[in-house]
Each structure stands twice: as C-alpha cells, then as structure tokens.
Amino acid sequence: MTSLKNDVFLRALQRQRTPYTPVWMMRQAGRYLPEYRETRKKAGSFMDLCKNTDLATEVTLQPLDRFPLDAAILFSDILTIPDAMGLGLYFEEGEGPKFERTLREESDIRKLAVPDIGSELRYVTDAVSQIRRALDGRVPLIGFSGSPWTLATYMVEGRGGTDFLTIKQMAYARPDLLHHILSVTAQAVTAYLNAQIAAGAQAVMIFDSWGGALSHYAYQEFSLQYMQQIVSGLTKESEGRVVPSIVFTKGGGLWLESQAETGADALGLDWTISLGEARKRVGSKVALQGNMDPAILLSTPEAVEKEVARILADYGIGNGHVFNLGHGITQFTPHENAEAMIKAVHAISSKYHL
C-alpha cells in the first residue's frame, strides 16, 4: 500500500521523537458535521451506514477533508461483534443501541461462539481496505473494537445507559457464566482486530467504555485481564511497521499502572485525571492519549485554545502524547470549535518537542 506522508501519530504512540503533538478526536466522524448528517440521511439508518462500504469510507474521510487531523478512525460501531454473534443489534432514535436477544440464561451463554469474522464482519474489513486506498497515505488509519467487558454489558443488559445491575449480579453470583462470555468475546475481539490489521489498519484501539463502573478488584478480574489477552494476541507488525495498540478505560484513572502492564503501546485518558500526573505514574512505559473534556468544545474558540494550552503544558516537554478528547465529541459541538482545538494543538505544541 501507499507509504505514509504523515506518520506523526504512529511515532507518538511509540514515544518516538515528533515535531509536534498529533491530534485526532474520538467520534470525529459524527453528527456535529453537517456533511455527516447528509450522508446518514442517504444511508437510511446508522447500521446501514456502517454496512455500506462506500458511505462508511465517505464519512471516515469527512473530518479529514475539513480539519488537519493526524489520524483517521474507521467509521463503525463497537457492537458489531455481538451483532455478528446473532444477538440482533438495532437502534431506536434517541435511545441508543439495543439487542433483540440477551445473554442471561446459562443455555444461551454456553452456546455463545466466536463468529466467522471473514463472512459476518466482512463489511468492516472491506471498509478498512477501501478507506486505506482512499487515504492514499495521507494519515494512518485506526481500527477499533469494544472491550470484552463493555461488549458484555450490552449483551447481558440488552441496552446501554443502565446501572449494570444484571451483569454485576452475574459477576458475583455466577462468575463462571460471565467469564465464559468474556473469554469467547476476547477471542472474537482478537480475531476481529487482527482482521482489521490485515485489511490495512495501522493502529488499533480497545474501547473499555464501561470499565469505570467496576470496583477495583472486579476491574482486574472482569475487564483488564481480557484486554491483556487481546493485546498479547494482536498482530504486532504489518507492512514493515509496528502496529501500535491503545487501551482506553473511561473512568479508569485509578488503574493506570495495571493498564500499563497489558502490553499496550498507549493508554487513553478521560478528563478526570491530570495528564501530568498520569505521565509521572506511567509515562516511562506507555504513551498517553487525551484528555480534553468534550464539553469544553461547547464554549468558545478562545476558551478551547486556553484549555489546549493548559493540557499541553500539563504534559510538558517531550514525546509520547497524542492529543484527544477524554471521550467522544458530542453532536452539539460547533465545528468551528473543533477546528480551533486542532489548530491550537499544532500551533502550540511544537515548543514542547525540542
């Protein structure tokens, strides 16, 4: 495939020297962009958009055509794996994702199997290949998946936005059943991410969106160990380059030291932790990605630039930082503020890279 014209993001993940701090945004292809809303309308539904290779490519590239971002991320959803397992993913307007079938009965749980990635999720790998061709080496492409714990919350609860009582009850009353779900899902995620790498993904990220809902010991048992299994099973090199991995637990700032032992190249941080403090704790082992509160993008360009300067100063001089939000950009964000953030990162950060 075409050689990269901008590999600053990949070098930052490996804590190599870079001329500035690279920047991208979680959910950078999304509803805050008018062009995305037009394409979504054309697709009909969110999943139709994900499963249409041409349209998924189009929306992946939209933020790059508008902003000077340093990475593209595959447009897809974290719940593609449970859907491929036959749980029947669907979306209700204003309510988020739901599943027609849940995993609560032992008989259903024991039947759970790793899906055939090549057939059931071919629409994802086809999109990865097409996006790589369309990027033509402009910036690297990130592939991703949800973590086993986060996927299991949807598989057991049947929807997002819950208090997690059903899955936590299973964790404490029948941990054997939950471990079976997590083990099968970890195998599926490993195969899925490796398929994305084979199709052209140049870095991969594991989104543990709900890991922060767990207690200290439950996090180690039901989330972290499975992410570690995935990282250890990932393809480490493709096309003659290292394929870096990022682990991100929202609300996981207490466990950075444990996360740094997973073998991941970088850790994602939300906005509840000081970036400088995180660097002191684990910066000698891993790169760090984050960690602006997405709500700041609802303010003014001036306020955004001030916060960018503060975050960059908090990390300080040196390499190994990828600027990002602490979670996904909201649909209400003025795109002018997103642009102000990206341009400010590039303008201000060079003085920290000597």
UniProtKB/Swiss-Prot annotation:
One of its GO terms (biological process) is protoporphyrinogen IX biosynthetic process from glutamate. The record marks 77 as: Transition state stabilizer. It is found in: Cytoplasm. Gene3D superfamilies: 3.20.20.210. It catalyses: uroporphyrinogen III + 4 H(+) = coproporphyrinogen III + 4 CO2. Pathway: Porphyrin-containing compound metabolism; protoporphyrin-IX biosynthesis; coproporphyrinogen-III from 5-aminolevulinate: step 4/4. Keywords: Cytoplasm, Decarboxylase, Lyase, Porphyrin biosynthesis. Its EC number is 4.1.1.37. Its main location: cytoplasm. SUPFAM superfamilies: UROD/MetE-like (SSF51726). It is an enzyme of class 4 (lyase). Substrate binds at residues 27-31, 77, 154, 209, 327. CDD domains: URO-D (cd00717). GO terms for molecular function: uroporphyrinogen decarboxylase activity. GO terms for cellular component: cytosol. Homodimer. Catalyzes the decarboxylation of four acetate groups of uroporphyrinogen-III to yield coproporphyrinogen-III. Belongs to the uroporphyrinogen decarboxylase family. This is Uroporphyrinogen decarboxylase. The lineage of its organism: Bacteria, Pseudomonadati, Pseudomonadota, Betaproteobacteria, Nitrosomonadales.
